[in-house]
Structures are given as C-alpha cells and as structure tokens.
Amino acid sequence: MLQEHNKGTRQYELPFGIGLAISAQDGLRAVKQCSSELDYLRRKEYGLTRNVVYRKRCVRGVYSEDADSRDSVTEVDSPLLGSRADILDLDNECKSISSPNSPVKAQSCEPITLQVSKPFPTADLSNVMFGVATTLSRLQDSIPQFSHWLSGTGALFLAIVVDDSVTDDDLDALESMYEAHNISLTTIRPWNCSFDVNEQHFAILHDLIDYSTHETQWIAIIDDDTFFPSPYSISQLLASHNASEPTYIGGLSESQGAVAFFGHMAYGGAGVFMSMPLVEQLDSHVEDCLAQSITRQGDGLLNDCIRNYTQTELIAIPGLHQLDMRGDLSGFYESGTFPLSLHHWKSWHQAPVDKMAKIANYCGDCFLQRWKFGGDSILANGYSISVYQDGITQAELDLMEGTWEEAMGYEATMGKMREKAGEGKKKSYRLIDAEEVDGSLRQIFVLHGASDMDLDGEQEAMDEVVELWWDWPRGD
C-alpha cells in the first residue's frame, strides 16, 4: 500500500509483514525498524514526516483529594516541554540526527508530578435505553466512540438502520461486533420506511417503548456522533432527577441563531433524556405529531409533541453540548470546561474524541483540565499543548478564546471571549492518539509542518511530536 511519507519520498508496505521500504533515487531501499519504544511513530495513520522533532515528558499522576479545582488553572513552575529535543529519522531506526552519538533513550525522560482526581466509579446505566437512527456504515465506523462510553455500563442500545439494502446477516454481524465490545445493541428496520432519517429520530419512540424492560427508567435519543466523555457523569446527571415523573432533559444549541429559528428545545446531538412516564405519555401521539408538526427534524418533532400533549418543561443542562460551531474549536476545548456531551466532532469540526477522553479512565475529572507551565505553556489535558510566545495571564485564561467561525457572536451563550491569538503568537500541539501501554497512558501531540533545511539545503517540512507518558502509583 502506497502512502505519502515526506516530500520527495514515498513509503511502501512490503508483503508478508516483513516491513517497509521507501523510494529513493537509487530505487527502493528497506526502512530499518525503530526501537519498540519509538516504532509507533511510523504508524501510517499518523502521517508524520520522515524527520521529526521529538520530545518526551513523563508525568506522574498523584491522586489527591486536594487536587485543585478545574475552575482555576493549576500553575507548575517547571517548563512542560523541557530542554531536550531530538530530531529523529523515522526511516533509519529512529536515530537522532541532532545528536548522532547519543542514542535516544525513549524510556527515560524529565519527570513531573501532577495532582489529579481519582478515576470515576464504574458507570451503571442499566436503567437507560439509548436510541439512534442512522446507516449501517456509520454504526460500524463509530464503534470506537460508542465503546468509550457504552461498554460495560449495562445500558441498552437500539438502532434503526435506515439503509434500504441492509440484510439480516448485516444486522446480525453488526450486533456481534458491538457484543464483542460489551455493548448490548439491538438493530431494527424502520416501522415506516417513508420517513427520512431525521423523522426516524422521533419515530423511534414507538420502538424504544417496545424494547424497554422493567429496569428501564430513562430513554435517551442521540445522534450517531453524540459522544459522552464520562458515562459516570451521565449516570450522576440522571440520578439527580426524578425518573418517576415526566421529565425532559437536554441541552440548547450554543448558536442564538439556531435557537431563534428552531426554538427552545433539547437539541438532539447533545443527547435528549426522557423519563419513562413522559415517553409513555407521548407513545399514543407519535403519528399525530408526525402529521401535525411543521418541522421535520427529530428533536423539533419531539419538542412540539411534548409541548402539545404534555405539561412537561425542558430542563436545560449547560454541559450537554450541541456544538453548533464550525471551524477550529480549540478555544472551546482549551477553556477548561468538563463537557457532559460533545457533537459534530467529525463534521463541523474535527476532534478524536475517544482518544481525547481516554485520560478520563485514569483520573476522571482531569479530562480537559488545564495546567500552566513556566508562564507560557498550557496543557489542556487530552486535547492540546499550547505555547504562547509572549506568555499568557490568568485574566486571559479566564476567557474562552474565540477560535471558530463568527465566535464573537456566541458570547451571549458561552460568555465573554478573548480574540483568537495572532499569527505566530501561539504554537499548538494537538493530540492525535492515546493508548494504554502496560498500565501507563501514552498521549501523542503533534504540530505539523514546521520547516527546516534538508541535507541538500532544500526546505522541507518537519513535524514536531510531544509524547506525554502518564504513570500512576500501582495499587492506588
């Protein structure tokens, strides 16, 4: 398989798992493997340049009841990135070009200790049934994200698969894939195939009633790109409300324009939660609501039906995020907020949410928590490392950075903002991967495209990589 590796260089996977080769002026030549601690840098999906600037920092997480509140930014005197950086040749055993006589010792790095909260308890969502309407392929593609928050929770998951050509074997295979991830998925076809996928998000109410059990207290309707960083936080949210009364919980859009146009309602991408008494009230009115409502959006149909046939009012939860913003959402993710839900992460903006939130498995409330190092660097845990050329003050950090399109128009819903950092004022390393390695967590942050001169004096791109290696005291 051919892949781009660097300007003027193409990399090939050799057959039978024997390694890699790259094209060169004298033909193909083999790529020498890196050490086991560094070989991950050559993964095809990372798309790194042949030569990279590499830094590693070891972080020791110490569980503490006194861990600083997320409302403030914890300050650390020492720099985050440290003084050591190596330029590695990924096509030549990941050898250091900058210090050829000093081999890179990937296992040793400058340590730093951070106080963090303990992991959240295991979530029990056995009283919740989640429902979605989407295509077979999107359900297949979304297994890593659904696994993060559904696996092992005991929740029921019902999916209307809207493809005309889907077969029983397709549905059985999909259920087996989810079962392998400890998710109880039931797939069904629409009871009315004339409805589009948006209408199916409301019509699914009938099915959710039919497939609920005596344990089911809550019904949740979501989009296929709704993501909950912490299932425990969702269980706590629901536990704080009365499931024996008609209850309607959700999040408004952050866009004033969307709320003005679509209305004051629970927006579906943020997650809509209803108690069983409310769903039972609506069940007999589904066909009438489909016939009467002007809107054809599932969340709008649901809201109109609730307003027309019940006395239940919306309980709006700020942490449930529709994220109706386009472009660069780094300002949101770097603001220190702990989101209950995220949306549009693979369409209106791009964020590897399942990899980002992996840190929450180790220190719960520390996901997207901020630490300030040496006056100029901010770690937004799980998302980015930002280095500010002129430093950054607490007053500036108290304001969300308006990085996305027309961001200043969101101040009414998201609070006062600061302007986006000017060109060259902020250097951002974004997380591209996170994985457990022998009980530790490795986070990989990348800054693409920094320039340098190659051996022939030509300017070439060179990516920068920061590896954070998290360890926790065993047995804590």
Predicted features along the sequence, with ranges:
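C-terminal catalytic/acceptor-binding lobe
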Residues: 1-112, 121-124, 307-476
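Short, acidic, metal-binding catalytic loop of nucleotide-sugar glycosyltransferases
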Residues: 122-125, 144-157
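A conserved hydrophobic helix/loop-capping motif in glycosyltransferases and polysaccharide synthases
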Residues: 127-137
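Phosphate/oxyanion-binding active-site loops and adjacent basic polyanion-contact surfaces
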Residues: 138-142, 193-202, 227-230, 267
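Short coil/turn segments at secondary-structure boundaries
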Residues: 142-147, 162, 170-176, 201-202, ...
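Active-site-proximal specificity loops/subdomain of glycosyltransferases
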Residues: 161-218, 232
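Short beta-strand-to-loop acidic/aromatic patch adjacent to the donor-nucleotide binding site
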Residues: 215-225, 306
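Conserved catalytic core of nucleotide-sugar-dependent glycosyltransferases
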Residues: 226-309, 313-324, 332-337
